[in-house]
């Protein structure tokens, strides 16, 4: 594999995965034959610890691009969910990206709760899980609902589209810089502090390792807070508001002291980061991965269309130069050039006529018999001018400057330009 292409391992294998219901998912489902099959709008109430499987749809429909399946397990007492097959077991993952997603999900999944909600795509792999009540067996309910349009999923997709097309504008906006910095400081304090202290870290490798650790830690804390958001807001509202106010002011002060990026390199880096984030949001905001890949490719093509058009126009211009014949360039003569060429061509033609008349085979008697002025023709053959002084004077009076022909042309143009009465 050439250097710099290692990231393809994370993305190319999902393109070749089999659709839901293919051999890998069927084998996984057959490994737990006693599990009950779940369908949409199912409502199961039982007090027996059992396992359940939801078989994914094999036929893809474009109307369900933002649909999700929600399985809710509720009980008066504590219960736990154990995944048997699927992406949450981390045993049959084919790519590094799938393994990281599996480990991350299992890392912040709540182990014990009275209500557990599982949300997944209806076009993924088969999901099997078992419900194990903690302590004494109590009656619990398993309900399955399908959201045709999950507005949270659609909101993530729309946000990705907006970020992609307005990444350059947002990277140059001071308002976006201060607002995004404040929000980042509130939601991901560790990442914000690391970015503020970047200049004090000499090695990029150390900074990269710290960034990965701070990012995963911030995501874990954020997911834990989102799961307990209702409890935090009801019981600790004052502390939540105090944290948001204090950390928000500190984050805004830090961003204000540093100021928005002034150099072009920092702005370009922020623009590329926003566009990469937009592609991630587009991918995570669609339930069908094939459609997500198609939208991402269309976005990249729309972004690079002016580069492609410019390259195509340059190629077409080169090909036209190679194969097309050069067009003739026509230049019009000036009055002086026209007069000079006319005099030269006339003198050359008259000289050719003299030479032709001096040839032995020239029928001189026949020519003399047809001429009105044979003496003038003989003088012309011997070297005299072909025009007499009287003819030259008459021509100048008729066609020269101030002549009758020129005056007639001028007066006729003026008459045509006058409006009709």
Swiss-Prot record:
Keywords: Membrane, Nucleus, Signal, Transmembrane, Transmembrane helix. It is found in: Nucleus inner membrane. The chain crosses the membrane at residues 147-167, 175-195, 206-226, 232-252, 279-299. It comes from the Eukaryota. Residues 1-22 form the signal peptide. The keyword Nucleotide-binding does not apply. It is a multi-pass membrane protein. The keyword GTP-binding does not apply. One of its GO terms (cellular component) is nuclear inner membrane. Belongs to the NEMP family. This is Nuclear envelope integral membrane protein 2. It comes from Rattus norvegicus. The gene is Nemp2.
């Amino acid at each position: 594999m050439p250097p710099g292409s290692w990231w393809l391992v994370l993305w190319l294998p999902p393109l070749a995965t089999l659709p839901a219901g293919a051999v890998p998912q069927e084998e996984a489902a057959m490994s737990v034959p006693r599990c009950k099959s779940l369908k949409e709008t199912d409502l199961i109430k039982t007090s027996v610890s059992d396992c359940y499987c939801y078989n994914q749809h094999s036929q893809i429909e474009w109307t369900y691009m933002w649909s999700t399946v929600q399985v809710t397990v509720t009980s008066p007492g504590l219960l736990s969910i154990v995944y048997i097959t699927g992406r949450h077991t981390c045993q049959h993952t084919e790519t590094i990206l799938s393994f990281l997603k599996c480990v991350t999900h299992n890392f912040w999944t709540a182990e014990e709760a009275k209500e557990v909600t599982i949300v997944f795509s209806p076009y993924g792999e088969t999901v099997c899980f078992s419900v194990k009540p903690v302590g004494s067996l109590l009656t619990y309910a398993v309900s399955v609902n399908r959201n045709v349009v999950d507005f949270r999923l659609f909101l993530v997709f729309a946000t990705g589209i907006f970020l992609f097309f307005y990444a350059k504008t947002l990277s140059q906006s001071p308002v976006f810089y201060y607002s995004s910095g404040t929000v980042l400081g509130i939601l991901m304090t560790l990442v914000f502090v690391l970015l503020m202290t970047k200049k004090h870290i000499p090695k990029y490798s150390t900074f990269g390792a710290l960034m990965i650790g701070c990012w995963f830690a911030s995501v874990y804390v954020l997911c834990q807070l989102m799961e307990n958001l209702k409890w935090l807001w009801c019981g600790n509202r004052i502390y939540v508001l105090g944290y948001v106010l204090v950390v928000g002011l500190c984050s805004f002060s830090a961003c204000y002291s540093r100021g928005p990026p002034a150099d072009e390199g920092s702005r370009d880096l922020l623009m590329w980061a926003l566009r990469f984030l937009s592609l991630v949001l587009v991918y995570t905001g669609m339930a069908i991965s094939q459609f997500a890949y198609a939208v991402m490719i269309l976005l990249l093509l729309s972004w690079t269309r002016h580069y492609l058009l410019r390259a195509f126009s340059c190629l077409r211009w080169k090909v036209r130069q190679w194969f097309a014949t050069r067009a003739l360039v026509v230049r019009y003569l000036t009055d002086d050039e026209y007069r000079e060429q006319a005099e030269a061509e006339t003198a050359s033609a008259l000289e050719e006529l003299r030479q032709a008349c001096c040839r032995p085979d020239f029928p001189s008697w026949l020519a003399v018999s047809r001429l009105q002025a044979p003496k003038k023709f003989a003088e012309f053959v011997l070297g005299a001018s072909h025009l007499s002084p009287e003819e030259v004077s008459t021509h100048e009076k008729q066609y020269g400057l101030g002549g009758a022909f020129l005056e007639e042309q001028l007066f006729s143009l003026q008459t045509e330009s006058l409006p009709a009465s």
